[in-house]
Amino acid sequence: VRGVHVALAVSASLLLWADRYSDLDLLVADWMFDHASGTFPWRGAWLADRFNHAILKSWLQVLGVATLAVAAWDWWRPRPGWTASRRIGLRVLASAAVLVPTVVSLLKRVSASHCPWDLQRYGGSEPYVRLLEAVPAGVSSGHCMPAGHASGALWLLALAVFWLPHQPRKAAAAGAAMLVFGFTVGWIQQLRGAHFLTHTLWSIWIAVLIVDSLYRYFAPVPLKKL
């Protein structure tokens, strides 16, 4: 558990540095942008636009609602034979299905960052504004960070909790798989020009923080003392 907190602190510092002092986001977006046509080629691609942004999003929303329904039913009428770890896992997963997308959405509302496809650099009309940088006079906030679409998949990180605390390796494998899945969803959005790399990475950071906090909240008392 302490290792997670150290990883969160270190990764937050690295992300803040990358946002403020590096051109990582621009370098990745430049690579994805076709300067000859002046477009992000994947913006209208079926896989990126129709499947990833619409179909997959709907599937994940249905899965989230189903998870909430099962958790609510078990809370109202606890299923006999369910272990404490399974019940904790279900409650963490259901809570994450709500909190991860909600927190990311609320942070987007106060974000100044614009999406790549809105920037002058990529054929749009807005200037590039770094994290914590003041928005130039006359320029509206972009509300594009963190990555909202990725957060719709990143709540599945909570699946790792079903193997805790007795099978940490399986928990780590499940968590890693879901992080890769969430990152892939975010990466495809980046190919469309909808987000920068750090937008997706901040969503991952937030998801890890929320899932860790939920597990500590729902877990048995001995775990909370770690």
Which residues fall in each region the model found?
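N-terminal transmembrane-helix/juxtamembrane module of multi-pass inner/ER membrane proteins
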Residues: V1-L68, K108-S111, P116, E126
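Membrane-embedded catalytic cores of phosphoryl/pyrophosphoryl-handling enzymes
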Residues: R2-L8, V129-L226
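Aromatic-anchored segments of alpha-helical transmembrane domains
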Residues: S13-W17, V98-V103, L179-Q190
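Cytoplasmic juxtamembrane regions at transmembrane-helix boundaries
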Residues: A69-A94, W163, Q167-A177
